[in-house]
């Protein structure tokens, strides 16, 4: 066999060892040709070499491992595309050179003499390897240990025993090649010793894990059998009681509920306490309530979000008129969730006057997302424990509102609305706003600890939405965690649209009427809005429509069959006298009176500032519950006018000899803020110059001592209030020009906007006759 050329069979992922029989499936055309060539030879010998890279499809000599095995083909079976052969290894060989590559690979090879080294080291290694092999077989299949031991013992040479062990030891391809290349028996025994030692260690660890798991299973089975026997004995003795049945039910629920491991251990501990506790014990009901809470909380139960943007937009448009900024932000979040399911939900804060739809927008969001909705009012909340829960050591302890809300929804990812967050209180019992910092912070709320539950609960999947009428009372750290979305008030035309699309039909249905029985024309609706409601939202408007519907329902119930069409004249009979007249602008203003625009929690308002000169008086008197900022604005306006008296055509003698009294009507309502500065300056100038301010003009803006007009907030609400009052001209700071884009188009068209940088420009527009 020395230096002869043989048909060569490359192997992708296995090795043929001498004296072992290996079944092979041959599918490559070159390999099949090599098999056929070997079978056609007299000795049926074939050289078998493992490939260096199994991914090589047509290997040459350089692609094969240096060492291989010459084998004899014992059997061959043909199938459609492959050839199945049985090859017995004879001896190790080394490739010398390639003779041919086509039609099959043929290599010239050299036979490697079988190592015959001996000595005490080889004997010691050999015995250790045989012991490790026996231990491995015992760990895997003890029942075949004796049979395998006899098979190995029948093989005389240690090297042949090592090759035999490869058939029962799962070695990877590289280790098999490493073993085939071993030049001495010592090297081969050392390699096999290392492989077997690693395998035995892995099997021992696996057996230990299996044994531990089995012990735990046996323990639980034993407990189960003993409990069943105990229940049977108690039943025979007639000693069963409702408490035991209750505990049994709790334990069964615990087994059936998917709980985190930490929670399961705590619940198991509490149920065990219940079993040992008399039902009359003070802690019994508290412990039972705790277990029920832990079992009812949705630890891993979530609803699947509906991320159909088109459908979500339809739902939002169906439920609410306008509010484009809010709707766009919601759709943006849905788009982000669709592209990145792991994205954290934002904490939205809807800010706006009452009745503009803040709470109902939250309900629509939940409907669009397919999530459960839960609302929680925080107005007047002053105890931190209301949010975090009370510790169970206290009598009457309860979980906090957050955990109770999640329990009611039954899901871990509801949309939770925290209403009236601007009306949180605080006292000696703690600051609820500080507790909300943890609840709303995505970096902390993944492991929220309720004092009652005392287990980490993940709040990060909740979509938090808050509402407020104003941001002034919200602590700054809490405000920083929220994204502000403003919902300003509605114009009269928008209110008509909302009433026509949503409110009228709802009130007619609630009164048990049909739309045929009651109709409200646009003229009547407009009159109702202007004369019977004065609000930024539509809550009072809906109440008025409800009163009309109930009056008509009363008529129908008493026998009237004719359909009712409500006219403006009918409103006095149905609703009583007109409620609002002041919203109409004053037809003529006396000198010293100017119309200003104010922002309130209920929306915008027209505020008249009155200034009167006091003969022989001194200084300035301010009335109308004015805050410190408004008082400072009045003083700044007066100082500016005194310094510019000659330019403004104001008699300096009048200034020296007269005091001034500034009053802002609605004295029962506290007022503050810088936006009345230009109004006070105009009223004072009008009083000093004895020239009236234009009655069709209202204004807003902060002033400085040098006469600059600075920007203010709440422009949309103020403009809508002016529009409701019939104001035709509005003077605004130049820097507020950007805010006019938020004003509805029909309102912008009906009002002339004058933008001013200095107070002189304001006075020129507000008091046309000032310098004449």
From Swiss-Prot:
Q: What is the top-level taxon of the source organism?
A: Bacteria
CDD domains named in the record: RecA-like_Lon
Annotated signal sequence is none
Main location per the UniProt record: cytoplasm
According to its UniProt record, the EC number is 3.4.21.53
User: Where does the Lon proteolytic domain start and stop, copy by copy?
Assistant: 588-769
Report the locations given in the UniProt record. Cytoplasm
Reaction catalysis annotation: Hydrolysis of proteins in presence of ATP
Catalytic EC class: hydrolase
Q: Where is the active site?
A: 675, 718
Q: Does the keyword Ribonucleoprotein apply?
A: no
PROSITE patterns attached here? LON_N (PS51787), LON_PROTEOLYTIC (PS51786), LON_SER (PS01046)
Q: Which Pfam families match?
A: AAA, Lon_C, Lon_lid, LON_substr_bdg
Q: Which Gene3D superfamilies does the protein's record reference?
A: 1.10.8.60, 1.20.5.5270, 1.20.58.1480, 3.30.230.10, LON domain-like, P-loop containing nucleotide triphosphate hydrolases
| InterPro entries noted in UniProt | AAA+_ATPase, ATPase_AAA_core, Lon_bac, Lon_bac/euk-typ, Lon_lid, Lon_proteolytic, Lon_Prtase, Lon_prtase_N
Question: Where ATP is bound, by residue?
Answer: 352-359
Sorted alphabetically, the keyword list is: ATP-binding, Cytoplasm, Hydrolase, Nucleotide-binding, Protease, Serine protease, Stress response
Q: Which family does it belong to?
A: Belongs to the peptidase S16 family.
Enumerate the PANTHER family for this protein: ATP DEPENDENT LON PROTEASE FAMILY MEMBER
The name on file for this protein is Lon protease
């Amino acid at each position: 066999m020395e230096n002869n050329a043989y048909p060569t069979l490359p192997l992708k992922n296995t090795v043929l060892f001498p004296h072992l029989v290996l079944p092979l499936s041959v599918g490559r055309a070159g390999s099949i040709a090599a098999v056929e060539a070997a079978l056609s030879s007299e000795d049926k010998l074939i050289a078998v070499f493992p490939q260096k890279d199994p991914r090589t499809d047509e290997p040459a000599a350089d692609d094969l491992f240096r060492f291989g095995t010459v084998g004899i083909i014992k059997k061959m079976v043909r199938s459609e595309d492959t050839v199945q052969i049985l090859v017995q290894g004879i001896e190790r060989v080394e490739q010398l050179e390639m003779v041919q590559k086509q039609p099959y690979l043929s290599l010239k090879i050299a036979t490697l003499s079988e190592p015959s080294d001996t000595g005490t080291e080889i004997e010691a290694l050999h015995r250790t390897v045989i012991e490790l092999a026996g231990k491995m077989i015992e760990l895997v299949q003890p029942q075949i240990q004796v049979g395998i031991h006899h098979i190995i013992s029948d093989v005389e040479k240690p090297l042949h025993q090592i090759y035999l062990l490869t058939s029962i030891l799962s070695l990877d391809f590289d280790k098999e090649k490493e073993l085939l290349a071993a030049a001495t028996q010592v090297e081969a025994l050392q390699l096999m010793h290392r492989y077997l030692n690693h395998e035995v260690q892995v099997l021992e660890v696996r057996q230990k894990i299996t044994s531990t798991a089995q012990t735990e299973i046996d323990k639980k089975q034993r407990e189960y059998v003993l409990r069943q026997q105990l229940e049977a004995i108690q039943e025979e003795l007639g000693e069963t009681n409702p408490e035991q049945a209750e505990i049994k039910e709790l334990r069964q629920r615990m087994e059936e509920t998917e709980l985190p491991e930490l929670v399961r251990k705590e619940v198991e501990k509490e149920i065990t306490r219940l079993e040992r506790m008399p039902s009359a014990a003070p802690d019994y009901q508290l412990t039972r309530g705790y277990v029920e809470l832990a079992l009812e909380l949705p630890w891993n139960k979530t609803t699947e979000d509906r991320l159909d943007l088109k459908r979500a937009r339809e739902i939002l448009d169906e439920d609410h008129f306008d509010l484009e900024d809010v709707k766009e932000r919601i759709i943006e979040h849905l788009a982000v969730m669709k592209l990145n399911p792991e994205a954290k939900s934002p904490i939205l804060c809807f800010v706006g006057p009452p009745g503009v739809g803040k709470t109902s927008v939250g309900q629509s969001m939940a409907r669009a997302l397919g999530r459960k909705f839960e609302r929680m009012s925080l107005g007047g909340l002053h105890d931190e424990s209301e949010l975090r829960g009370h510790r169970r050591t206290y009598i009457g302890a309860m979980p906090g509102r957050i955990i109770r809300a999640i329990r009611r929804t039954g899901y871990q990812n509801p949309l939770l609305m925290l209403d009236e967050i601007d009306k949180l209180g605080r006292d000696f019992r703690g600051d609820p706003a500080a507790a909300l910092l943890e609840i709303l912070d995505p970096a902390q709320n993944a492991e929220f600890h309720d004092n009652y539950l005392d287990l980490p609960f993940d709040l990060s999947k909740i979509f938090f939405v808050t509402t407020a009428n104003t941001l002034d009372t919200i602590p700054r750290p809490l405000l920083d965690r929220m994204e502000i979305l403003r919902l300003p008030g509605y114009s009269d035309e928008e209110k008509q649209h909302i009433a026509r699309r949503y409110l009228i039909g709802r009130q007619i249905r609630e009164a048990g009427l049909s739309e045929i029985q009651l109709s409200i024309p646009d003229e009547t609706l407009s009159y109702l809005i202007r004369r019977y409601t004065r609000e930024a939202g539509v809550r009072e408007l809906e109440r008025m429509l409800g009163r009309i519907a109930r009056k008509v329902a009363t008529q129908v119930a008493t026998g009237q069959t004719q359909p009712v069409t409500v006219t403006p004249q009918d409103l006095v009979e149905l609703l009583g006298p007109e409620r609002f007249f002041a919203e109409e602008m004053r037809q003529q203003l006396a000198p010293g009176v100017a119309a200003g625009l104010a922002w309130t929690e209920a929306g915008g308002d027209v505020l008249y500032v009155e200034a009167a000169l006091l003969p022989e008086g001194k200084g300035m008197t301010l009335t109308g519950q004015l805050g410190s900022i408004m008082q400072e604005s009045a003083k700044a306006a007066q100082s500016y006018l005194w310094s510019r008296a000659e330019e403004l055509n104001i008699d300096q003698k009048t200034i020296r000899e007269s005091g001034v009294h500034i009053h802002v009507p609605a004295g029962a309502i506290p007022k503050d803020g810088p936006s009345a500065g230009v109004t006070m300056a105009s009223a004072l100038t009008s009083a000093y110059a004895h020239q009236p301010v234009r009655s069709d003009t209202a204004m807003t803006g902060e002033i400085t001592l040098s006469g600059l007009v600075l920007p203010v907030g709440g422009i949309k609400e103020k403009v809508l209030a002016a529009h409701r009052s019939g104001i035709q001209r509005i003077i605004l700071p130049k820097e507020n020009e950007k805010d006019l884009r938020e004003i509805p188009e029909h309102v912008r068209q009906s009002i002339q906007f004058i933008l001013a940088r200095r107070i002189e420009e304001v006075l020129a527009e507000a008091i046309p006759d000032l310098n004449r």
